């Protein structure tokens, strides 16, 4: 079982590397890692489990965050309508996105970042992601709102990008052009 001890923190060079594509069909080792990742995210949202194992609640995790430089992400998040998006994916890729942008009014956080980084993180309002599910099926997801933001955050990790790289350095709370805030 993964715990916070397995989550590497900012400053570790793995977080700045571009992760490798996962060879498909996925090996047993990669499948096990991805299963552990989605279990970690789900467990972190369960108050009892989070307390028992000292887990910081999270809604997404990318393999580089546990020291595995491979293109794998786990997301477990509910949108504004209460729809659950729970996905464990290999080789996710954003294949299209809206022109319109959004940002979380409270900013973003990250399990690999132990400090608060104030500022708006510009994200696309809508994205389409293509990936391979943990069961080996090709999936295409059309996402908007919080799920779209979470997927962009996790896919950034696969490209060595941290959320705070997107924050305007001169004016952290400048609303990005063509954007509307998303409240969480």
Swiss-Prot record:
Active site residues per record: 154
Top-level class of the enzyme under EC nomenclature: hydrolase
Residue pairs linked by disulfide bridges in the UniProt entry: none
Cross-referenced Gene3D superfamilies: Peptide deformylase
GO biological process, one term: co-translational protein modification
Cofactor(s) the protein requires to work: Fe(2+)
Keywords: Hydrolase, Iron, Metal-binding, Protein biosynthesis
Cofactor binding summary note: Binds 1 Fe(2+) ion.
UniProt-recorded Gene Ontology molecular function terms: metal ion binding; peptide deformylase activity
Pfam families hit by this protein: Pep_deformylase
Chain residues that bind Fe cation: 110, 153, 157
Coiled-coil stretches noted in the UniProt entry, renumbered to this chain: none
Reactions the enzyme catalyzes: N-terminal N-formyl-L-methionyl-[peptide] + H2O = N-terminal L-methionyl-[peptide] + formate
Function: Removes the formyl group from the N-terminal Met of newly synthesized proteins. Requires at least a dipeptide for an efficient rate of reaction. N-terminal L-methionine is a prerequisite for activity but the enzyme has broad specificity at other positions.
Entry's family note: Belongs to the polypeptide deformylase family.
Name of the protein: Peptide deformylase 2
Protein's organism: Bacillus cereus (strain ATCC 14579 / DSM 31 / CCUG 7414 / JCM 2152 / NBRC 15305 / NCIMB 9373 / NCTC 2599 / NRRL B-3711)
